[in-house]
């Protein structure tokens, strides 16, 4: 009888452990999904408008002998990016050494847009420096906000001999 009670106790303990693990997995999955939905919702201004404007600027700059490269970052839990962002840089077609900084446009939690710069695409976020631009919101990207940032990148590119 004692061995049967022990067996039942062990089985009940195993079942509790399995249920606790399942509950933790479901909680983590729900948190992950909520973060992904929030990230996607805040990405909307970048997805639709910014990429269209950058593509237009890319075509215009190609006619002028320069190239615009950009990288749009989508949600990836492994990268630990909290905010949607797009990075772009303007460089010469023939001389890649002449280039602007990499401009990083990021939409933070409260809908504010933060513009920062770093030297190259591979540089870590610890090297980001604030860009001296006016405070923006995601909605202002659809007006002249993004164009101003692209113009600043073009000005920097020209100053570096582009």
Task: Please provide the spans of the model-predicted regions.
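Charged, low-complexity eukaryotic segments
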Residues: 1-26
């Amino acid at each position: 009888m004692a061995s049967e009670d022990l067996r039942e106790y062990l089985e009940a303990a195993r079942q509790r452990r399995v249920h606790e693990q399942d509950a933790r997995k479901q909680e983590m999955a729900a948190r992950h999904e909520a973060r992904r939905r929030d990230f996607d919702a805040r990405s909307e201004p970048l997805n639709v408008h910014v990429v269209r404007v950058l593509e237009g600027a890319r075509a215009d700059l190609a006619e002028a002998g320069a190239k615009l490269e950009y990288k749009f970052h989508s949600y990836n839990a492994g990268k630990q990016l909290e905010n949607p962002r797009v990075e772009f840089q303007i460089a010469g077609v023939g001389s890649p050494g002449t280039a602007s900084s990499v401009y990083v446009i990021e939409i933070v939690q409260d809908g504010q847009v933060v513009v920062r710069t770093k030297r190259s695409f591979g540089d870590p976020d610890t090297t980001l420096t604030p860009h001296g631009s006016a405070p923006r919101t995601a909605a202002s990207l659809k007006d002249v906000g993004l164009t101003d940032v692209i113009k600043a990148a073009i000005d920097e590119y020209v100053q570096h001999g582009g």
